[in-house]
């Protein structure tokens, strides 16, 4: 969707002048791509047919840990970051990102330990990181009055900015006389 938005904005701006701000994607360096837990050569996707391939933000801790325990890895047992070990490489990237440890620190921490212990640690780490977000989500879900007030407030803000942009677009394309 971002690329389509960028294309439309660039095309419109090219014809009518600068009207739209071109959106830029934010991609963190360490998590530019989190790979599938079941096929580490493919990007993790919530729409993957295999429910064990991805971690959803609202997965409960047991589900998260179970998915990491089932993550595809090679038959070697050495926890080492290497392109020929995409499954372990993916898990190391995830653990490194969540803990803030370097890849070398992760390798050292799990030196001499097996994949089972490492997968459990990654699962627990991710589950613990998601817990505050999940707790806040469930807390907000209980307060329907607050949620409705936020929706109303932001609906009004969105309408204001959308109308402002629409008037700008109408003026640029010469529709100001016909549309009020």
Task: Walk through the language-model features, giving the residues of each.
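Conserved nucleotide- and phosphate/pyrophosphate-binding catalytic cores
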Residues: 2-180
């Amino acid at each position: 969707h971002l690329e389509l938005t960028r294309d439309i904005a660039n095309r419109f701006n090219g014809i009518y002048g600068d009207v739209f701000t071109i959106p830029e994607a934010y991609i963190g360096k360490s998590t530019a791509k989190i790979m599938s837990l079941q096929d580490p050569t493919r990007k993790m996707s919530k729409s993957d047919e295999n429910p064990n391939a991805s971690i959803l933000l609202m997965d409960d801790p047991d589900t998260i840990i179970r998915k990491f325990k089932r993550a595809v890895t090679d038959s070697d047992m050495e926890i080492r970051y290497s392109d020929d070990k995409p499954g372990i490489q993916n898990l190391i990237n995830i653990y490194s990102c969540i803990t803030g440890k370097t890849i070398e620190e992760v390798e050292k921490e799990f030196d001499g330990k097996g994949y089972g212990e490492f997968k459990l640690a990654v699962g627990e780490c991710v589950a613990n990181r998601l817990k505050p977000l999940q707790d806040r989500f469930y807390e907000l879900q209980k307060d329907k009055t607050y949620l409705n007030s936020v929706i109303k407030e932001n609906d009004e803000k969105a309408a204001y900015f959308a109308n402002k942009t629409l008037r700008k677009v109408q003026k640029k394309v010469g529709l100001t006389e016909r549309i009020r």
